[in-house]
Structures are given as C-alpha cells and as structure tokens.
Amino acid sequence: MFWDKIKDAFSSEKSVDYNKENKVVKSRFTMLVKGCKDEGSILLVGDVYGTVKKEDVTVLFKDGKVSHLKVAKLIDSTGNDCESVTDAYAKIGFENIDKGEDFKYALITNIDFQIESDVNKAVENPYILGLLYEYDNNYNDEDFINLFFREMVMSHYLLPVRMSEDFKGSGSTVLKKDTKIDIYGIELQGGINALPVFTDWTALKNWSDKGPANWKMETIIESFPDIVGFLKGEGGFIINPYGPQSFYMNSESISSIVNSPGYQSQFGDAKIETKVAKGGEKIFLGYPPDNEEVAAIKKRLVAFGNAHSEINLIDMMLRVDETGTKSYLVITDIDDSDVRKYYKDIYNSCRDLLREVVYLDFATLEQADFAKNMMKQPPLYRKN
C-alpha cells in the first residue's frame, strides 16, 4: 500500500534506478569473523551465509580498512579441507594475510564493497548485511552494536517509490518542480506502518516478487539521513522486510541515533578548528595509499576544484602525528582571503567517505612550505 503522504521533489537531483534487476550472484556470501586461529597459518572462523569458494574476496575491517585477498584454504565444521562451504561454520585461510590485524568483527565477502553509491552499479551494502545476519548473536556486545549502527547510518539503501512522471533508463536526474514521489509503506504486526528500505537488489526482489504482475519497479538510492528526512519524525523504517534478514527501527531509536555525538560529528554542522603546530613536533608526511577511500576523496576534491574558479590548486597528503593519529592533509591555493569557508565546504563534501582515516586537515600552499620536499608528484588538481 502507499503511505498517506507524498514528498514533493522541487528540482532535486536523485539517483534513480528503474527496473534494474541486476543478475543475482548465486554464490554471494558474507562471514563475520568470530575468532582467529593459528594452525600453522592464520585461519579466520565464523558462520558463512551463502557459499564461499577459493576465490578473491574483500575483507572489511571495523576500523574502516579494506583488503582484497584470495582464499587459499577452506575447512568445514568437521575439520575437512573443502572447495566450498555453504551456510555453515568454516575456517578460512588467505594468501599473504597480515597477522597483526585486528580481525574481530571483520567481514569477509565476495559482494562488491561500495564506499559511495554509484548509479551505474547495483547497490550493495555487504557490511551491514553481514552484521544483520549476526545481530541476534551479538546484540549484547557494545563493540558489535557500535559497529552495527555505524554501518547502518553510513550505508545507502534502495527505496521503492512511484513517481508522477515517467522516466527511462537509470542514473542521476533532476526531477521537475511538480514531480511527486509516492512512498510505499508496509504494515507490521500491531498495525505499525514502516518505510521499507533494502540493502541490495537481492533483498528487494524478495519483496517485488510479491507484487502484482507487470509491476513497474521504480527505486531511488537514499542515504540514512535522507531516509530520516522522509520520515519527518514520524514512524520508523525496516531494512529488508522480506529477508534475508530484517531489522526494524522505530522513531525513538532513530531519534537516539540522530542526536548521538557520533552521528552529529558525521552528519551535523561541520566545525573547523585552528591548530598551531607545536615546536619540535615530529610528523610523518607522505602520499596516501591507493584504496577505495582515497580514490573517492580525490574524485570529490577534483570535482570541488572544477566547481570553483577561484581555486588554483588542490593536493592531498597523509599526515601522521606523534601519537599515531592519521589525517588527510588537504593543501589549497585559493584566490580568496577567507579560505576557512572553503575548508568547511570541502569537509562537508568528503565527510561521508572518511572511514579508515576520519580527520581532514587543511593548509594553504604558503602554509604548507614544510611539505614541499615531499610533494614530488603533480598536484591532484590544478586550474587550467
């Protein structure tokens, strides 16, 4: 059924995906690491949901790090070496694994990790999906709960809708002023209405298959703050209402998360503080490693430079202070005496990507004289 409210979309840009039922990979799997055993080599243990084989996989760590490894060894619950494990306990060994990593609550998966939504790819949220499978077993663990809600608010979801205007294809589009978006709702036990959102097309298909024949499935991709905005303080939402694993958030729980310090630091008003370097302070400075987080931030910085003609240069380095705290140092050359307003805008444009490294530092090109000896490569962005 439809909810009794309709959202106006006044010239807003939406990531729209219509009838894009991407091929379901039958061997999709997640495994949340429960422990680590050294049996001549490091083996990660946990319950597999789906089918894991000796293949290339992604390991998502709770500190935001992402590794791409190859499964070299699979041991089933009886202790036998095997080629695959389906929906069962397993021990997994990898080629070239770093024994010094903290593997607690790391997620092993062959589902694509997406640090940001991409309308040209099927939406995937493997970490929150894997955490959903294990919620009932770990909800009393504070570390698990903190990780669970962090991933919930940082994920992007498929929201099924019906629009008053017909569209073709998929991608990012600017909706016309009078476009109406009808939001679907489902009724839970006790007569509670909830907004259904989905982690991926596999979960959405479980619901769409229950719809009428020839039903035109229209979806938009929304972040957690977007979903909260749709609710406007009323009611709750349910993730994957028809499986593979569901989770309901009522309005009280949503309010508790939105008002938490962690959420406000991630999505609230950005605060820029002036830092004065201490005399004799030792820092490490170099180029950040090539990974999904760094690549996505670089892309945003280049786009920001292209959108502001007064910006002459943007570069990005990795800074590590004496305590081991990491930050990305964004170096700018701007034809404006009030550079702080740009810092805030740059931070807001990149903050949702900060997972492994959660801080951004800023310096003008003049202030960054200390970094010139390290800046061996062409700048990330230079105005033509």
Regions found by a protein language model. Give the residues of each.
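Beta-strand/loop-dominated core regions that host nucleotide or nucleotide-derived cofactor-binding catalytic loops
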Residues: 17-115
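An interfacial alpha-helical scaffold signature
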Residues: 2-18, 111-384
